[in-house]
C-alpha cells in the first residue's frame, strides 16, 4: 500500500464500502483518459437532467442513498447540488467527505473554496486530502496556489501526486502564478522520493511552459533533459521526454534528435 493509505476512523462501518476501492473507482471515473470515452454514446441532456434530479433526491436520503447521489455528482454538473454537497464536507465519515470533495471538484463553487482548503490542511485522512488536491485543480482562480505548494512539499505521496498535477492548473493562469508553481515542480522533480510525483511534476512543467518567462523556460528544459537522461525510474524518464516533445520547440526537438543519433536515448 502507498503511504497515503491511512487508517480510517471507527465510524466508517456505517457504510459497507471499502475506502480504497471507492477512492480508486472515483479516481478512475474522474481522472480517466478522455480517449477511453470516444466510442461511448453521450447521454442526452434529458437523461443527464433526470439523473441529476434523482441525485438531488438521493442526497437527502439515508447513508446508502447519499453515497449514490454523491456518485452522480462526481460525474455530472448541476449547480443545484452545491447547497447539498457543502454540508457533507463536515461529515464524520471520511468516505462521505472524500466523495463530497470529488463532487465539488466536478461542480466547482466559490462557496467550496474555504472549506476545501481547510480540509487540505487539517483533515487527518489521506484519502480526503488526496481528493482535495485533485479538486483544487478545478479552482485555478481561487487562492489555491500556496496551499498546493505546501502539500507538494510536506504531505504523503498520493496527496503530493495530485498536488503536482493541480499546480499545473492553478499556475496556468498567467506568469505571476506560473513561476512559483514551476519553481516548486522543478524542486519536486529533482528531489521527491516518489517516482509518480516526479512524473506528474514533469508533466506539470510541460503544461506551464508557455506561461513562463524565458529564463525559467530554459531551466525547465535543462531540468527535463537531465531527468530524461538520469532519473532512476524509467517511467519518469519517459514522462520527461514526452514533456519535452510536447513543447514543440524546434531547438528542443533538434536536441532530442541529437541525443537519439548519439545513442543516449532510444
Region roles according to the model:
Residues 2-61, 67:
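N-terminal "cap/leader" segments of large eukaryotic alpha-helical scaffolds
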Residues 20-24, 28, 251-262, 266:
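Polar/charged alpha-helical tracts
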Residues 128-132, 159-164, 226-230, 258-266:
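Short, highly charged low-complexity linear segments
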Residues 13, 23, 28, 118, ...:
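A subset of signal/propeptide-processing and intrinsically disordered low-complexity segments
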Residues 61-62, 92-93, 124-125, 155-156, ...:
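Short inter-helical turns and helix N-cap capping residues of alpha-solenoid HEAT/ARM repeat scaffolds
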Residues 45-59, 78-90, 109-122, 141-153, ...:
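Amphipathic alpha-helical scaffolding segments comprising HEAT/armadillo-like alpha-solenoid repeats
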Residues 24-46, 64-79, 83, 87-90, ...:
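Structural detector for internal amphipathic alpha-helices that build alpha-solenoid repeat scaffolds
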Amino acid at each position: 500500500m502507498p503511504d497515503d493509505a491511512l487508517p480510517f476512523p471507527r465510524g466508517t462501518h456505517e457504510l459497507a464500502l471499502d475506502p480504497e476501492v471507492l477512492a480508486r473507482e472515483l479516481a478512475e471515473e474522474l481522472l480517466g483518459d478522455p480517449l477511453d470515452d470516444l466510442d461511448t454514446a453521450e447521454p442526452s441532456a434529458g437523461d443527464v437532467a433526470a439523473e441529476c434530479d434523482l441525485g438531488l433526491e438521493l442526497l437527502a436520503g439515508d447513508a446508502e442513498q447519499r453515497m449514490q447521489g454523491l456518485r452522480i455528482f462526481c460525474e455530472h454538473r448541476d449547480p443545484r447540488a452545491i447547497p447539498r454537497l457543502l454540508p457533507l464536507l463536515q461529515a464524520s465519515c471520511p468516505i462521505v467527505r472524500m466523495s463530497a470533495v470529488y463532487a465539488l471538484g466536478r461542480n466547482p463553487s466559490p462557496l467550496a473554496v474555504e472549506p476545501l482548503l481547510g480540509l487540505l490542511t487539517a483533515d487527518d485522512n489521506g484519502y480526503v486530502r488526496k481528493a482535495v488536491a485533485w479538486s483544487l485543480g478545478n479552482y485555478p482562480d481561487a487562492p489555491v496556489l500556496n496551499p498546493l505548494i505546501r502539500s507538494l512539499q510536506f504531505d504523503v505521496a498520493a496527496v503530493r501526486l495530485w498536488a503536482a498535477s493541480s499546480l499545473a492548473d492553478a499556475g496556468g493562469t498567467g506568469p505571476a502564478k506560473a513561476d512559483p508553481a514551476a519553481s516548486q515542480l522543478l524542486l519536486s522533480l529533482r528531489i521527491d522520493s516518489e517516482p509518480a510525483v516526479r512524473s506528474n511534476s514533469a508533466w506539470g512543467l510541460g503544461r506551464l511552459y508557455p506561461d513562463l518567462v524565458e529564463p525559467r523556460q530554459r531551466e525547465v528544459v535543462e531540468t527535463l533533459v537531465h531527468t530524461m537522461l538520469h532519473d532512476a525510474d524509467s517511467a519518469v524518464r519517459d514522462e520527461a521526454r514526452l514533456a519535452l516533445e510536447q513543447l514543440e520547440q524546434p531547438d528542443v526537438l533538434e536536441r532530442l534528435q541529437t541525443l537519439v543519433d548519439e545513442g543516449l536515448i532510444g
